[in-house]
Amino acid sequence: MSTENRDTVYIGKKPLMAYVTSTLIQLANLPKVTIKARGLSIGRAVDVAQIIARKTENAGYSIGDIKIGDIKIGSELLESQDGKTRNVSTIEIAVKRNN
């Protein structure tokens, strides 16, 4: 895995808690992790960020306060299987650890 991708969690079709766990593991070693998603996975990315921010606060999580940072939205041009170019919505959510 390249260094630039270690601070990024890409949201797909796995169970929600798999992404929450992955993000928390990365936050134990890094000050900031970016959650990225596109298309139908955007809602799941928001859910992951909210679970991390709210549940760790209530549980007294040991790596410090976790806050949601910058949120970026946009779109990408992707070519579909039928050869047409389509706009797909994207989101990037920064989750930060305060020491």
Residue ranges and their predicted role:
Residues 1-27:
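Histone-fold modules and their flanking histone-like tails across chromatin and transcription assemblies
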Residues 14, 38, 96:
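Structured beta-strand/turn binding interfaces of compact recognition modules in eukaryotic regulators
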Residues 64-99:
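C-terminal edge-of-domain segments
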Residues 28-49, 53-56:
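Charged, well-structured alpha/beta interaction segments
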Residues 13-14, 46, 70-73:
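A short linear-motif detector with a strong N-terminal bias
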Residues 6-8, 24, 30-34, 65-70, ...:
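Beta-strand-rich binding-surface signature
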